[in-house]
UniProtKB/Swiss-Prot annotation:
Residues 199-269 bind DNA. The keyword Nuclease does not apply. This is Protein pop-1. Keywords: Activator, Cytoplasm, Developmental protein, DNA-binding, Nucleus, Phosphoprotein, Transcription, Transcription regulation, Wnt signaling pathway.
Amino acid sequence: MMADEELGDEVKVFRRDEDADDDPMISGETSEQQLADDKKDAVMEAELDGAGRVPLIGGLKAEIKAEPSPSFPMPSMLPCGPYSPFSGLPIMFPMVVPQYLSPNPNINMMNMMTMRAAMAGAPLSPAFPAMFSPNPLFPFPGVVAKQHLENTMPMHMRAGPLSSLNHMKMPPYMPHQMMPQHNERRGHGGGKVKKEDHIKKPLNAFMWYMKENRPKLLEEVGNDQKQSAELNKELGKRWHDLPKEEQQKYFEMAKKDRESHKEKYPQWSARENYAVNKKKPKRKRDKSVVSGSENNDQKKCRARFGVTNTSMWCKPCQRKKKCIYATDRSGSELNDGHDGRGTSGGCSSSSESSSPNNNQPMPMNAPQTVAAMHAMLMGMQIGQSAHLASSHSTGSSGTSPPVANPSDSESDVDEDEDIDPTITQQTQEYIMQESVCTL
């Protein structure tokens, strides 16, 4: 078309020059008629010479003097690239469909793009046979083939300005037989998978009574608003008030139910409904607890010497206090907080003999340790009593010395309140030194 317009301009300029030179007195109407005829002949010759050109119909182009303008876009103004929305449209498309045109060129472009996208997915309409059907007037085999290919392709694979909208996530097409049966499951099962059938145990007599009389209880006035616990409580009271003759009826019903249940499920047991078969967690044994002779050191005097040998017990055990020889499971010693004396079962005393080879004291057993401690305390108490008696006799003249009562001395030894605190402190320090030497 560019060649046709250039040729028309050249003819127009040539005729104007020729008219000005040869016949300057020709009227305006005659010159315009002659110019239109010449332009018609030139365009016809150019179109007949070009291969694949569309022949004009009845001098359509000769009668219409079309010039490119923003309100009337010519085919030469439309982009014809491979990715353009106008690549598959016929050449005379803007002139055939003028109702989609607008004075605004941007709106014209959007109208063209929208129409092409609509026609790409729609079947060919018989209202526009000259635009899309391959006939002698508009032989467009390439356009028809391209449109046929686009019609066979899915919507989301077609090239076009609205192809991005076609990429939206939509459910794939599936035949009616292959559709998932979600609706059917929701209609029948409520959307929940049915669990395996749970075998219930047969009903007893009271359950049969409650099953039969619960609807009657609900029909009574005021019971429809009560909770289930209140209704069960009322049914229990009525069951206890029921005579034995009437209760026997429900016992027979329960017996028949048990027999039928046993015939139906011969291998069933009520233990299957409870957690009897579950594995119980094994209790881990405390590794700190040792067995044999080592465990003997952790026992108290009562467990170590027995109930009959109370003379071998330590003083805290005799007074039902914490034992000074027993140790807890962590290995630490249990000390008596009242009298402040505490030592291990393997401590040594002053009477133990040392080895001549290695100069290390030999540990004594528990009875020897207790006896040594008693002897030490008795000796210290006797020495203190003798010292006090001698000082008293020398200090007082003309008086007879007091007679010592052995029962009083024994009671003083047994009771901690009569022992001098200084002696107790010295005894504790001595015992601590001996225990350090043993360790």
